[in-house]
Structures are given as structure tokens and as C-alpha cells.
């Protein structure tokens, strides 16, 4: 029977060969030389495919004694003309998923590969956690060693500011008793314990008293200038209350109270009328007015190597609107008063941290220290960074101290996104774009610097 089977197979094989020979021998007569050649090549390819099919093992996974597969993959799998790039990639991934260890195969049956242990995923998560903890430790170290100001230095700087404020208040009451002012008070990041690196800056707010029936404020977006975040202070009822009815009529330009003229008035007092060397000698400080254009600024040396800058900031309050005489960056808007949002922003930040013992203020102080120590980030202001944190606080609820690294990275990504859009809306007044005073070039430089550091944020801590 075996012999008959072998003869039958051989007969079948010879029959196919005889048929092929007959076709090839007669093709020349019918198709000519060229056609016969093409038909011969095609017929030979069919015969090789037939030979491979009848010679392949019954199981494609049966192994030879060497442990490798006993049949080779078809040559067309490597042909660049038959496989495009996507197919090659898919094929490569498919081949890589096949087990290559010989122990994964049995000589008779195919055993599916064992699933990867869940421990590997846990190891990846652990590695990420270690990287996050490493950044967390670096952030805390940076804050302790670079950003935080010693309590003693803060106290001495505040005391110097309080002493100078008291002297200025006494002088104004004595020399200009008719100037309607409320009590001056200190403000700024040093006063709110949000200053970083050095205790070198504080603001002295000088509130003007305006008659409510003689003055009104007009939002900048409602004017032809269309500048949200700024206001015009207009003189009202001039037909019933003529010029001179208010002390501050002397600072009116074109029917509006000019912050520049108000600042010039105080400059004459601060820089020209007060004997600061004598006051400094009395207080054991070195005090001198800053040179122009910082007209309303005092430079104070309260210790041998400690300096403090005090900014005098005239302020007006009309209803619920608080404005300060900090000019717009562009000169054509020097008649506008700036809306004061910093006190409300700081109060919200402090309230959020007090509610859950969060790390929002800590994250903000680290960002401020980085920007203060990195010249390329010098255009970013404390208000902009504060609003980035406030926006992030609306998205993320967990601000526990161990989440500092995650929130720091999120703040960086958020800041980059705002720079990319060119818009950072105020968290308290979304109509105000806090990037409006930056030039496109400055925005590009800030975004580029932060984007380059995103892959390795530790670089920011080395400045």
C-alpha cells in the first residue's frame, strides 16, 4: 500500500510535469519567442509554489532539532515592492510578539505564551513615583536654600518700611494739611509673606480721597482705546461744581484725573521737599530717591548689605473699584488708571491654602524665585504667576504637600499653553488679559525658555 501511494504521488507529480512541458513546447508556436519566455517564467513560479505547498509540514510551529522553525518564511515578506511601510511596521510588531524562547514550544503542541506579570507595570509606576519624589525633594531643597527669606531679614525690612511710612505721613500732615488723603499703608509680596530670594521690595499705598458726586470711573473696554483692566477717572458735574471744587481738579487733563499728573505732584513732595538724608540719619538708614524714570521710588539701605526699594503708589477708590497709578507700558495710555486685583488675588490664594493646608503659595513662591533668578523669565510678573496657580486650583482639588511636584509641572505646562495662546485671563476678571502688555517677541522668548525646560525641569532650579 505504501508503495502504491508513493507511485501514485510520483505519477501525479510526473503528470503535472508532463503537462507543463507540453504547454511550454507549444507556446513558442502560438505566442512566439517573447511570449513563450514570459509564460515559462510564470509557469515555473506556479510550479515552485506547488512544490513548497506539498513539502510544508502539517504544523507550522513544529521545530527541528536545532530548536528553530523547520520552515523558512516566504521571501516575499522582505520585498520592498510588495510591503509598504505600514505593512512592514505591522508585520514587525506581529513577529516581535511571537515567543522566541524554545521552551515556549512543544514538539507536538503549541503552548500560548505566558502573560506578562503585573509586577512589571508596578515597577514602571514605582519608577515614575521615584522620579516624582526626586523632583519633589529638589523643589523643597530649592525653596529652603534659594527661595525662602529668613524671618529675621523679613522683619527688619518691614520695620524699615514702617519707619519711613511714619515719617512720610507726619511730613504730609504738617506741610500739606489740605491734601485729602486716607492713611497710607504697606502692601506687596513682602507684606503678604510671598516675597522670595531677598526682602528687597515693598509698596506704600497712598489713598486719595475723591468726592463721589464729582468723579466716576469708566472701564477701559468701554472707551475707544479698548483696554480691559484699566479705567478712566472722569470729572463729573462741572456745570454745577466748577473747577476748583475738588482739591484734585489741579490734576485733571482733558476732563479726566491723570495718574501721571498725580504722580508728578507726589514726586515734588517725595524727591524735592523732604530732607531724606536727615531722616535717614535719624533712623540709622541711608535713604535716597531713585533716579528717573522711577520718580516715586525710595532706595533704602537699612543694613550694610541689605537694600529695600519702596514704591509710592497713589490709589483711588470709587464704589467697589480700587485703582492705582501704575501706568500702562505704552505711553499712549498714560491717562489710564490700573485696576488693582492683587489684594483680592492674594486673599483668595491664602483662603484656599488655609482651607486644606495646601501648597499653592509654596508652588507660587518657587515659580517666582525661578523667574527672579532667570533673566530669560524676567518679564513674568507675580500677578501672572499667581493667576496661573489660581486657574490650576480651579481644575485640581488635591493640593496636599506631597503633590507639589505634580502641581509644579502642571503649572509649567499651563503657563506654556497660555503663552502659546498669547492670552492669560485674570482669574477674578476674565476680560483682563494679563499678557496684553507683553510684545509678541517677549511671549515667544518666554514660551521657548519654558518649553525647553519642560523635559528636564530640574534645570530651572540650577539658575
UniProtKB/Swiss-Prot annotation:
Disulfide linkage: none
Xref: InterPro entries: Mab-21_HhH/H2TH-like (IPR046906), MAB21L/cGLR (IPR024810), MID49/MID51 (IPR045909), MID51-like_C (IPR049097)
This protein's record includes keyword Membrane: yes
Pfam families documented for this protein: Mab-21_C (PF20266), MID51-like_C (PF21297)
GO cellular component terms, semicolon-separated: mitochondrial outer membrane; mitochondrion
SMART domains, A to Z: Mab-21
Signal peptide as annotated in the record: none
Membrane topology: Single-pass membrane protein
Topology, Cytoplasmic side: 47-463
The organism's place on the tree of life at top rank: Eukaryota
Protein family per UniProt: Belongs to the MID49/MID51 family.
PANTHER family hit by this protein: MITOCHONDRIAL DYNAMICS PROTEIN MIEF1, MITOCHONDRIAL DYNAMICS PROTEINS 49/51 FAMILY MEMBER
Subunit structure: Homodimer. Interacts with DNM1L.
Function: Mitochondrial outer membrane protein which regulates mitochondrial fission/fusion dynamics. Promotes the recruitment and association of the fission mediator dynamin-related protein 1 (DNM1L) to the mitochondrial surface independently of the mitochondrial fission FIS1 and MFF proteins. Regulates DNM1L GTPase activity and DNM1L oligomerization. Binds ADP and can also bind GDP, although with lower affinity. Does not bind CDP, UDP, ATP, AMP or GTP. Inhibits DNM1L GTPase activity in the absence of bound ADP.
Protein name, per record: Mitochondrial dynamics protein MID51
Organism, as annotated: Mus musculus (Mouse)
Organism taxonomic ancestry: Eukaryota, Metazoa, Chordata, Craniata, Vertebrata
Amino acid at each position: 500500500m505504501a508503495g502504491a501511494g508513493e507511485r501514485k504521488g510520483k505519477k501525479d507529480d510526473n503528470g503535472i510535469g508532463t503537462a507543463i512541458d507540453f504547454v511550454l513546447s507549444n507556446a513558442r508556436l502560438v505566442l512566439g519567442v517573447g511570449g513563450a519566455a514570459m509564460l515559462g517564467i510564470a509557469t515555473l513560479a506556479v510550479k515552485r509554489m506547488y512544490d513548497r505547498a506539498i513539502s510544508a509540514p502539517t504544523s507550522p510551529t513544529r521545530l527541528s532539532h536545532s530548536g528553530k522553525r523547520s520552515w523558512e518564511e516566504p521571501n516575499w515578506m522582505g520585498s520592498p515592492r510588495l510591503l509598504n511601510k505600514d505593512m512592514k511596521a505591522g508585520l514587525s510588531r506581529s513577529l516581535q510578539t511571537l515567543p522566541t524562547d524554545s521552551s515556549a514550544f512543544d514538539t507536538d503542541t503549541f503552548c500560548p505564551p505566558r502573560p506578562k506579570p503585573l509586577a512589571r507595570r508596578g515597577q514602571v509606576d514605582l519608577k515614575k513615583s521615584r522620579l516624582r519624589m526626586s523632583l519633589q525633594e529638589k523643589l523643597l531643597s530649592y525653596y529652603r536654600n534659594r527661595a525662602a527669606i529668613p524671618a529675621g531679614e523679613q522683619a527688619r525690612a518691614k520695620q524699615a518700611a514702617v519707619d519711613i511710612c511714619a515719617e512720610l505721613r507726619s511730613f504730609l500732615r504738617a506741610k500739606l494739611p489740605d491734601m485729602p488723603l486716607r492713611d497710607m499703608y504697606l502692601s506687596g509680596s513682602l507684606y503678604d509673606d510671598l516675597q522670595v530670594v531677598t526682602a528687597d521690595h515693598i509698596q506704600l499705598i497712598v489713598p486719595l480721597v475723591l468726592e463721589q458726586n464729582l468723579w466716576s470711573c469708566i472701564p477701559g473696554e468701554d472707551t475707544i482705546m479698548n483696554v480691559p483692566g484699566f479705567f478712566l477717572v472722569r470729572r463729573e458735574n462741572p456745570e454745577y461744581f466748577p473747577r476748583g471744587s475738588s482739591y484734585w481738579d489741579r490734576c485733571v487733563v482733558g476732563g479726566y484725573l491723570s495718574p501721571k499728573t498725580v504722580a508728578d505732584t507726589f514726586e515734588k513732595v517725595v524727591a524735592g521737599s523732604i530732607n531724606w538724608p536727615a531722616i535717614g540719619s535719624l533712623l540709622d538708614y541711608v535713604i535716597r530717591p531713585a533716579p528717573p524714570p522711577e520718580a516715586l521710588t525710595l532706595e533704602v539701605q537699612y543694613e550694610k548689605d541689605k537694600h529695600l526699594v519702596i514704591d509710592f503708589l497713589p490709589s483711588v477708590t470709587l464704589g467697589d473699584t480700587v485703582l492705582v497709578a501704575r501706568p500702562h507700558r505704552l505711553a499712549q495710555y498714560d491717562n489710564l488708571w490700573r485696576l488693582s486685583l492683587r489684594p483680592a488675588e492674594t486673599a483668595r490664594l491664602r483662603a484656599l491654602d488655609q482651607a486644606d493646608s495646601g501648597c499653592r503659595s509654596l508652588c507660587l513662591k518657587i515659580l517666582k524665585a525661578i523667574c527672579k533668578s532667570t533673566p530669560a523669565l524676567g518679564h513674568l510678573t507675580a500677578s501672572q504667576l499667581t493667576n496661573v496657580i489660581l486657574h490650576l486650583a480651579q481644575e485640581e482639588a488635591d493640593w496636599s504637600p506631597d503633590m507639589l511636584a505634580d502641581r509644579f509641572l502642571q503649572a509649567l505646562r499651563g503657563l506654556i499653553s497660555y503663552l502659546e495662546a498669547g492670552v492669560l485671563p485674570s482669574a477674578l476678571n476674565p476680560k483682563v488679559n494679563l499678557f496684553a502688555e507683553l510684545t509678541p517677541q517677549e511671549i515667544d522668548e518666554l514660551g521657548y525658555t519654558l518649553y525647553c525646560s519642560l523635559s528636564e525641569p530640574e534645570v530651572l532650579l540650577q539658575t
